[in-house]
């Protein structure tokens, strides 16, 4: 009976999302407007609650709809961020007014979660330099991390769009602390090579590489050029939230030369899942590792997945094995 109810719930959800996709696709523009805001609010409201749906197992027609919807979400998100970035730039000190962005608190909570996961699972000194790939015109994540959690760290923000970087840089013009630690670069991650080796942590935005194969290529490229021991933070999605953002398979992260240390699926207003991984020193040419090597091949569902609340004690028990359990349990918070 439960399975039957789940199937009905999934079918109803897919039908609703399909209708919203059709309505959004008919909009003359995805720039912020009452109609755009109303439809995307309805979409997010439908996707955020816990759901039994596994979007990776939907049929071809639903998959095509989902892929198109994610592209629309990406375009709308870019226009929304550009709109608010321009609004903020009109202030003498834009960083004093970030709260006008309606989802700013979500970035605060997401960045806090990512910081705490890094602190618990990556045993190293405070990072000297961090890269954020896909920073966009509103680099809230870098700002929150720099201002609240990593006061001495330098941040290099990368985006394909030069206009997005121009907008972002204007937000920091009046700040002599965080602004001095922020730099913006217009580049495709595929064109970065030796630069990647200087970062202690690399953040990969959810919409960099929207198709699964593109995301896997980006991760493999990072694995080929990041320094051994450097951390990778990947934003993904879970359940119905996979209609909004791409879902990253931890196997692709393992095949890319990383060891997956933890996965967290929030069930609150933080929409993105977070995957913490570390570049392994024990990766062979075929992408496979040994011992704790990054190439460990995880079957779907056997990766250290932690459902909310993301309690670190439970995460340690899930992630570690044998003597590593004690090593992580006794580790000091380094970040």
Curated annotation (Swiss-Prot):
Enzyme class per UniProt: transferase
Transmembrane region(s): none
Positions of disulphide bridges: none
EC number: 2.5.1.43
Record SUPFAM superfamilies: S-adenosyl-L-methionine-dependent methyltransferases
Domain of life: Eukaryota
GO molecular function: nicotianamine synthase activity
UniProt keyword annotations, A-Z: S-adenosyl-L-methionine, Transferase
Single GO BP term: nicotianamine biosynthetic process
Catalytic activity, reaction form: 3 S-adenosyl-L-methionine = nicotianamine + 3 S-methyl-5'-thioadenosine + 3 H(+)
Family: Belongs to the nicotianamine synthase (NAS)-like family.
Described purpose of this protein according to its UniProt entry: Synthesizes nicotianamine, a polyamine that is the first intermediate in the synthesis of the phytosiderophores of the mugineic acid type found in gramineae which serves as a sensor for the physiological iron status within the plant, and/or might be involved in the transport of iron.
Protein's recorded name: Probable nicotianamine synthase 3
Protein species of origin: Hordeum vulgare (Barley)
Lineage per the UniProt record: Eukaryota, Viridiplantae, Streptophyta, Embryophyta, Tracheophyta
Originating gene: NAS3
């Amino acid at each position: 009976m439960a399975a039957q109810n789940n199937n009905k719930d999934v079918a109803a959800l897919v039908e609703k999302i399909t209708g919203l996709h059709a309505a959004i696709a008919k909009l003359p523009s995805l720039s912020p407007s009452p109609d755009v805001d109303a439809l995307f609010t309805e979409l997010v409201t439908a996707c955020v609650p816990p759901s039994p749906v596994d979007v990776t197992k939907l049929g071809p027609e639903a998959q095509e709809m989902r892929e198109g919807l994610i592209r629309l979400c990406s375009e709308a998100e870019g226009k929304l961020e550009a709109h608010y970035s321009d609004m903020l730039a009109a202030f003498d000190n834009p960083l004093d007014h970030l709260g006008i962005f309606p989802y700013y608190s979500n970035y605060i909570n997401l960045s806090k979660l990512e910081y705490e996961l890094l602190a618990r699972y990556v045993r190293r000194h405070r990072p000297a330099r961090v890269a954020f790939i896909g920073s966009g015109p509103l680099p809230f994540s870098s700002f929150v991390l720099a201002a609240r959690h990593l006061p001495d760290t330098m941040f290099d923000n990368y985006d394909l769009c030069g206009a997005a970087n121009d907008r972002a840089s204007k937000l920091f013009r009046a700040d002599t602390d965080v602004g001095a630690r922020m730099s913006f670069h217009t580049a495709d991650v595929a064109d970065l090579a030796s630069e990647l080796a200087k970062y202690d942590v690399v953040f990969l935005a959810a919409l960099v590489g929207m198709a699964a194969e593109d995301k896997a290529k980006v991760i493999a490229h990072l694995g080929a050029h990041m320094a051994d021991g450097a951390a990778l933070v990947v934003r993904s999605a879970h359940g119905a939230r996979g209609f909004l953002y791409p879902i990253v398979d931890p196997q692709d992260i393992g095949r890319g030369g990383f060891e997956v240390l933890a996965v967290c699926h929030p069930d609150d207003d933080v929409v993105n899942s977070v995957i913490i991984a570390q570049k392994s020193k024990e990766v062979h040419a075929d992408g496979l590792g040994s011992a704790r090597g990054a190439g460990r091949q995880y079957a779907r569902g056997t990766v250290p997945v932690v459902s909310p609340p993301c309690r670190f004690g439970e995460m340690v028990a899930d992630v570690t094995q044998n003597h590593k359990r004690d090593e992580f349990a006794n580790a000091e918070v380094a970040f």
